[in-house]
Amino acid sequence: MKKAVLCMVTLLLCLCAIAAQAQALTLTGLETESVAREWENHAFFERMRELTGVEMEAHGIEDEAEYRKMLAAMEGGTITADVLFKASLSREEEIGLLNSGAIIDLAPLIEENMPNLSALLSAHPEWKQVIELEDGRIASLPQLTQEPRQVCVWINSAWLGSLGIDMPRTVDELTQALVKMAGADLNGNGKADEIPADLLGVYEMRWLLPFFGVIADDYNVAREDDGTWVFAPELAGYREFVKTLREWYELGVLPRKAFTESHGAIALAGNDNDTVVSGLIVAVAPYTNVPGSAVFDYAPLLIADPDGQTRWRDLLGGVWTGCFAVTSACPDPASAMRWADALYEQESAIVAYAGVQGEDYDINADGYWYFLVDNYRTINDIRSNAIIYTGETMHGFVPNAFLNRVDSEQDRYVLENSAKVLAVSERVVEPYALGEQTRARLNELAASIGSEVDKGIARFVTGEMELTDENWESWLSGMREAGSEELTALLNAAK
């Protein structure tokens, strides 16, 4: 009798376990894709259920204000979902949600439930440092990649060829090349509409800084060889950078409305959209600024600095945090983590990026993959119903080996050149170097000082303020008073 009762109890426990595993978890997040995408009926979630055995009842929120309002309500105790996917959490939001008890610390769950992510973090301990808070807690899961796309300075090499000019190796050679572009009808439309340095505002102009030996980030700080952080405008190379921009402005290389107009706005106002007007651009890919047919006319420009070193700034790095979180309302955090772990395995991650082979994409005889589109199913249909990585950033390990084999010569060309730039790129300030209070103060200082940096550069370049020793020192002095020295002191204390 006792044996029968024991067997019955065991059976009931097993049935309860099965029921718990079969219970669908509720999932929500921010969806910013431009095409309509309904998570409730999206193929991705059913395919993930087939891969993991974990079912998600998904609902995407398209209005960012509504989504941020939901996050604020979570901090106040109103939790309406078990999982946040494409969560778009800032570090401040992560900390607030954790401290309020709205989301749980994922650190204790990773090793047991996420073998794929565990292996990646073991191989790249620096990645773990980025996702951990200063107390060791982990609020969210990241997107990881070994090949982060690079912002590049692209130069119109076709125009260089037409002018009989080699790829510039120095800033002086670059200036000479751009001056020659300004005086030639290189697009052949009979108009003087060429823009040699088609740069939009100070942000894009700052991507020229590595040519002057300055690798600076959005805090306007640079790192010396000994690891010490300095305020970038204090460096000699920074003044040379501003001096060169002033020269370009006077020579007509930099357009008069460089600080007020969008890319090629003046020229394109009177031209066909297929007309190439740009000599030098800053972009991840040329086709974001110029006609797609002209992509192969552009090559990334890397110029050695005065010390002979070729260096670049890696904008994003290999880790993007805030992508996936588990709420305190989740009845089965382990299952949520197992579901999430599938996207840290390359083959499984392809489901999010390209769908299923034979249904959404296929591979040709040359080994390149392509989407299966026809008169009845467009690429927008696939974006809407099959893939989900576009829009807000999702967690997982980007399947670069697969994506790099796309059946698009333009995309492969851009990816190959991005990899070349990545090889000489470096991060300036790693996020894990900063504690909560330090980061908050740095952001406050960077906002006020950054505005003064941009305004000062614009005034020097346009000639509103003459570039003299006195004016330069006065500008630097004003930024010291605004907190530039405190900015670098905070960073150096956090090393």
Protein language model features and the residues they cover:
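Bacterial N-terminal signal peptides
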Residues: 7-17
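Helix-loop-helix "hinge/cap" segment bordering the ligand-binding cleft or interdomain interface
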Residues: 107, 132-206, 220-273, 326-335, ...
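Conserved small-residue motifs centered on glycine
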Residues: 31-32, 342-462
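Extracytoplasmic/periplasmic substrate-binding proteins
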Residues: 95-96, 202-219, 246-396
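Conserved N-terminal structural module of periplasmic/extracytoplasmic solute-binding proteins
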Residues: 20-173, 207, 216-221, 226-233, ...
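Short alpha-helical segments and helix-capping/turn motifs at coil-helix boundaries
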Residues: 66-73, 89-92, 124-126, 175-185, ...
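Loop/turn elements at helix/coil->beta-strand transitions in domains of secreted/extracellular proteins
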Residues: 23-27, 52-56, 77-82, 102-104, ...
